[in-house]
Amino acid sequence: MKPKIALVGVGRFGKNHLRVLKELEKDGLCTLHGVVDKSNEILENVKKNYDVATTSNLDEFLKSDIDAVDVVTPANTHFELCKKCLTNGKHVFVEKPIATNYAEARKLVQFATEKDRILMVGLIYRYNPAVKKIKELIDLKKLGKIYYTFGHYMGFKEPRTDVGALLNFTVHHIDIYDYLLEEMPKEAICSVGYFLGRENFEDLAVLVLRYRSGSVGIVEGGWLPPGNYRDLTIVGSKKSVTSDLSKQTVILHDIYFERNDDTFKAIDKGSSTLAVKFEGPLKLELKDFVECIKTGRKPVANGEVAARTVMIAEKALESARLKRSVKIHESK
C-alpha cells in the first residue's frame, strides 16, 4: 500500500514538505496526489517544477480516494482544516502548533479518535537524531538524575502573523522536555516582551517549567536577537550534555560534584563528542507518518502530545499576564 497524500499549503515551510513528499514518492513510499494553495501564483510555480495536480479547493481532493492530508498553513487555520479532513475520514499531519488554543486542540484529538484516523503533528525535534541520542542517554541512566534543562530557539527573521514566540519557538523545547523527561511540569513561570508593538503576539518569551520530579526546564525564544540559536543543555547528577540541534552534535561532559560534609568538589574528567548520524528530521518525520498510516501505529508526535504543548504554552501566557507562577494541573 502506498498512501495517497494531498499537501495543503506551499508557503515558507510548505515548500520543504513538498520537496520531502516528492522524495518519499520517489522512494516508493507514498504518492503525492496533489497540492492545495489559495495562491494561483504558487500553484503555477508548483506545476512548472513538479508533476502533480494542483487546486485552490481542498474539497476536490477530499472527495477523491486520498488517504491523508498534510496541512502546512497558518496556525489560525489549523482547526477548521484538520476538522474538515478528519470528518471526511482522512488521516492528518499538521504542522505545529496543532491549534492556537487547548480547547480546539482537544477537539481535534476527539475527532481523530471518533473517526479512527491518524493525527500527527510537526513536533519535529522528536525526530532529530541529536535529541534521540540524548533520549537514549537519559533512558540508560547515563546522566543520573536530571537537575535541569535549558535551551534557546530564536533568531532574527520576519515574525509570524498568526502566533507569537511561545507557539512558534518555545513550544519546541516544551515538547523536547516532555519527550526527554516523560513528565508534565507542575508549574510555569514566564515573562514575555511585546517590543515590536504587536498587542496579540509576543516577540520574546522566557519560560521556566518546574517538574514534579524536581527537574527544571528553561527555554528562551523569539525573533529579536541576531544569529540563529537552536541549542539544548541537559545537566545531570552524573554527567551533562550539550547539543547544537541544527548541526545535530551531542557532546557528553563527564562533570559532577563530590560532596564532603558541607563542601563540594567540582570534578571535570573532560568531554567527548558522540557519534550521531546526520539526517533530515522532516523526512524522518513524514516517513513515519506514512508508516503510521500503513500500520495503524500511533505516532510519537500524536495529537495528545501536541495538545499538551499548547496547554503548557497557554499556562505560560497566563503566567506572563498575571506576573506570577501558574500551576499546571493537567495530568499526563
Regions found by a protein language model. Name each.
Residues 1-49:
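N-terminal Rossmann-like dinucleotide-binding module
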Residues 2, 60, 68-71, 290-332:
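C-terminal helix-rich "cap/oligomerization" subdomain common to oxidoreductases
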Residues 16, 38-41, 273-287:
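Active-site loop of classical SDR/Rossmann-like NAD(P)-dependent oxidoreductases
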Residues 17, 50-111:
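Beta-loop-alpha module in the N-terminal Rossmann-like domain of NAD(P)-dependent dehydrogenases
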Residues 99-158:
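A contiguous active-site-proximal alpha/beta segment in oxidoreductase catalytic domains
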Residues 122-129, 153-187, 202, 211, ...:
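Mid-domain beta-loop-alpha active-site segment that forms a flexible
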Residues 172-251, 279, 283-297:
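Contiguous beta-strand/loop segments that form the cofactor/metal-binding neighborhood of enzyme cores
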